[in-house]
């Protein structure tokens, strides 16, 4: 798998994958329409691509997923806005591979932060499996953080 900044020509494909991926959240406790903001918006994804926040996951020349990432000003903390894999490729280890690539994408990152809905048992288990520690929670979200080893930076 390759993780690279999204190409404008792939935005429609990335949005379609995002829509399919987040629409599957119904099967893990989400309500209909309980998806991330703008998950199905071409304009929003174009903006994320233009600002350098949208990445595409490519396997055998096919876009299979994406990530929205935000690096803080000093380059030490990476915020994962979202990651997604096309449901046609679920249960193949692509999500695990994508997150491991995200963790090493920006040199110098010391920690990664993200949040996920409390009701989404799939993503909460996924991030815990990857070594993310729950820092706090509110009525809707669990907030996770992972400190990266110096040898991985």
What are these regions (language model features)?
Residues 89, 93-101:
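Conserved acetyl-CoA pyrophosphate-binding loop and the N-cap/start of the following alpha-helix
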Residues 83-90, 116-117:
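A short, internal acetyl-CoA/4′-phosphopantetheine-binding micro-motif in the GNAT/acyltransferase core
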Residues 56, 62-71, 77-79, 84:
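Conserved beta-strand in the GNAT
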Residues 42-56:
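A short helix-loop-beta-strand connector motif used in the catalytic cores of GNAT acetyltransferases and
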Residues 2-16:
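A short beta-loop-alpha structural element at the N-terminal edge
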Residues 99, 106-118:
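Conserved GNAT acetyl-CoA-binding A-motif
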Residues 96-97, 118-137:
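Conserved active-site alpha-helix within GNAT-family acetyltransferase domains
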Residues 19-44:
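Conserved GNAT-fold acetyl-CoA-binding loop/helix
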């Amino acid at each position: 798998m390759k993780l690279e900044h999204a190409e404008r020509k792939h935005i429609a494909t990335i949005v379609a994958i995002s829509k399919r991926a987040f629409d599957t959240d119904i099967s893990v406790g989400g309500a209909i329409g309980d998806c991330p903001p703008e998950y199905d918006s071409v304009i929003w994804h174009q903006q994320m691509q233009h600002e350098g926040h949208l990445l595409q996951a490519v396997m055998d020349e096919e876009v299979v997923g994406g990530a929205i990432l935000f690096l803080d000003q000093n380059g030490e903390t990476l915020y994962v806005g979202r990651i997604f894999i096309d449901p046609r490729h679920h249960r193949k280890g692509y999500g695990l591979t994508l997150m491991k690539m995200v963790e090493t994408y920006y040199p110098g990152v010391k920690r990664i932060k993200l949040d996920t809905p409390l009701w989404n048992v799939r993503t909460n288990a996924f991030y815990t499996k990857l070594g993310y520690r729950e820092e706090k929670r509110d009525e809707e979200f669990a907030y996770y953080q992972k400190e990266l080893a110096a040898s991985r930076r």
